[in-house]
Swiss-Prot record:
Belongs to the imidazoleglycerol-phosphate dehydratase family. It is found in: Cytoplasm. The gene is hisB. Its EC number is 4.2.1.19. Its main location: cytoplasm. This is Imidazoleglycerol-phosphate dehydratase. It comes from Thioalkalivibrio sulfidiphilus (strain HL-EbGR7).
Length: 197
């Protein structure tokens, strides 16, 4: 399997974003988005997905964080799709349950080539510090649309909003890791009876 590394830039009137991902990395992350709590969540994806991930973003945060968060999701999705290439030899499906104290979340992913998001999360409060938790849904929708994956995210329980978010992002990283992992029994084979994804 060739190197699974991609770098993608997105420049609009609202945001300038650069994402670099190495799917076969060591879990190293570098983040500068202007949104410290989002940086913390992205670090969970890198660490628990065991991918090397660099994200630099400048956005119109003087308005709000919506454009920046959504566009980071879009650009990460594009980088993921590019790094995976034709998807031959991968496991395709991944899932993870992750607890953190009282919180528990489940994430299931399919590198199906069909964008679809089922996002079922009720945060116990609207903000974590200065971060609007509604924007996590926008992040995942942007990712799904541009990575062309089916993604199910369910928070099963949790009273602490920080814990809820952290379990989701850790589970997201672990599910991506499982789905993108090379399957030694599927070398050179597309994991679909259609012959393509």
């Amino acid at each position: 399997m060739s190197e699974r590394i991609a770098e993608v830039s997105r420049d609009t009137l609202e945001t300038q974003i650069r994402v670099r991902i190495n799917l076969d990395g060591q879990g190293k992350g570098q983040f500068d988005t202007g949104l410290p709590f989002l940086d913390h969540m992205l670090d969970q994806v890198a660490r628990h997905g065991v991918v090397d991930l660099e994200i630099v973003a400048k956005g119109d945060l003087h308005i709000d964080a919506h454009h920046t968060v959504e566009d980071i999701g879009i650009t990460l999705g594009q980088a993921m799709a590019r790094a995976l290439g034709d998807k031959k030899g991968i496991r395709r499906y991944g899932h993870a349950y992750v607890p953190l104290d009282e919180a528990l979340s489940r994430v299931v992913v399919d590198f199906s080539g069909r964008p679809g998001l089922e996002y079922h999360v009720d945060y116990p409060r609207a903000r974590i510090g200065d971060f609007d938790v509604d924007l996590f849904g926008e992040f995942f929708q942007g990712f799904v649309n541009h990575a062309a994956v089916t993604l199910h995210i369910d928070n099963l329980r949790g009273r602490n909003a920080h814990h809820v978010a952290e379990t989701i992002f850790k589970a997201f990283g672990r599910a991506l890791r499982m789905a993108a992992e090379p399957d030694p029994r599927m070398q050179g084979t597309t994991p679909s009876t259609k012959g393509s994804l």
